[in-house]
Every structure is written in structure tokens, then in C-alpha cells.
Amino acid sequence: QPLSETEFGELDDFLANEANEDRSMDVSTLEGFLTAIAIGPRMVPPSDWLPWVWDMEGGEVEADFASEAQASRIMSLILRHYNNVIHTFNTDPASFEPIFWRGIQWGAAEWSEGFITGFMFNEDAWSLLSMGQPTWFTPFLRLGTDEGIDITKSAGDAETWMNGIEPALVRIHAY
């Protein structure tokens, strides 16, 4: 079952709290990351990728949960969203809609940065695809890297690249 807006807000509040905000992903980054993990060329167990949710720089710092109940709730939301991404791509990939289309609080740049992080996390497995089909990755690079953002701002074509994300994801998943 997809997360509700309230559940996305709850997850975002946790990730943005003072104890986590400097190093953890926000919800948009998280979804991009989970999407790359979900559609990537090989399965990655949650135990390998979850530390990166809390510590984008090195995957070494643990989340700061106030209680066991909070830990259980947040983990449940993340894994449910991850499973929903997997389900969507396995049943109807064209219906996937990145969270950044739901509101301005969810950024396409952050989403793309998360996707790139997921890509880099599993770089060896992705390398053949990215070398063989580099244009499939252009939307993420134009929106999710400092150099790409500079080029995109200068060209004024962010919406073009945002619109290119879903078709690129469908092609990557089909590969």
C-alpha cells in the first residue's frame, strides 16, 4: 500500500529532525535512492542500503531514534515505500510518478541526487548499462549533480529533464 501524504510527512519530519538532518536523506532523496535500488541490475538487501539513508556521506552513522516504537514505525514506512516502488515497477512501470510531482516541498534535484547515490552505491552492476545507454541517465545527471544543475539553470530546461525521468526509469527497468 502506498504511503499517504501524512505518512510521507511523518517520515520527512523524522529525517529532518535535529539529530538526523545534517546527514540523512530527505523524503525526495530517499525515494530516488530507493528507486535506483529497486530497479537496479542486482538485488541489494536492505541491511546494505539502509545505513545510507541515515548517513548519505558514508553509510556509517546510525539513525537517532527516540524509542524502539519510533524505530519500528520509521523502518516500516521506509520498507513499505521501497516495496511499493518495487511493486509499481513490476506491475505497471509507466504508472510510477516520482514524489517531486506531488508538491514543491519534494525537489527533483534531491530526487535525482538520491537516484545517483543508489546508482553509485551499486556502481559495478550499473556500469555496463550506463556505458551502453548514457542518455538514459542524463535526466538524473542534469538535475542531481552540481555541474548538471549549473547547466540546467543556464539553459532554463529543468522541466524538460524532470519530464524525462519517468521514461528513463521505464527504459532502465526494462533493460
Language-model features, listed with the residues they occupy:
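Domain-length accessory/inserted modules outside core catalytic folds
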Residues: 1-112, 116-175
